[in-house]
Amino acid sequence: MRVLFLTISLSLFSIIHADDFAFSEFKPSEGTYYVQVIAVDKEFPEDEIPRDISPLTITYLNNGKMEAKFTVKKDNNCEEINLTLEKIDEPRKITTTRHLHHICDTVRTSEEKYWILSCVREFQGTQIREAELVGPNTDENPKALEDFYRFINRERFVERRIITPRQTEACTSENA
C-alpha cells in the first residue's frame, strides 16, 4: 500500500512542469492523468508492487496549490487518497503532502504533457529510488518511453525492475 501511495504521489509530481518556471506561471490542465511505466532501483515484496493504478484527477486550489485525487483498492476496501502538490524554491522540484512530506524531481520529456518523476524515500528501512512516466492518456507514446528509458539508464536503474501498471477505474465504497 505504501509503494502504491508513493507511486501515485510520484505520478502527481510529474504533472508539474520540469522547467524553472514559478509554480504560478505553469498551470497544467486540470483533469485526468495516467501512470505509464514505473522503475525502482531495489527489489520490492511482490504484494507491494503497484500492478493496478487508477487515474489521477488534478484540480487547482484557491491558494495556488494543486490537489491530486486517486483511489486504491486493497483487501476489497476502497480508499480515496488526496494529496496537496506545491512548487518549492528549488528548480524542478515539488513537494507532496498527505501524512508524509516528499520532495521529488520533475523532468520534462520531449513530448508535450509527458513527465518523468524521480523520488527517493525510505521503504522498510532502506532508501529506494523510483521513477515514473506520466501522461494525459493511456496510449503508449514511443518518444516519451524512449526518453524514460534514457533517463533510467542514465540514473542507473535496472531495467528488469520496470513495471507497466494496468490502468483501472477509480473505485468507490459501493463497488469495493
From Swiss-Prot:
One of its GO terms (molecular function) is small molecule binding. Its main location: secreted. The keyword Oxidoreductase does not apply. Gene3D superfamilies: 2.40.128.20. Probably serves a role in the transport of a small ligand released during the hydrolysis of milk fat. Disulfide bonds join C78-C171. This is Late lactation protein A. The gene is LLPA. Belongs to the calycin superfamily. Lipocalin family. Mammary gland specific. Secreted in milk. Keywords: Disulfide bond, Milk protein, Secreted, Signal, Transport. The keyword Kinase does not apply. It comes from Notamacropus eugenii (Tammar wallaby).
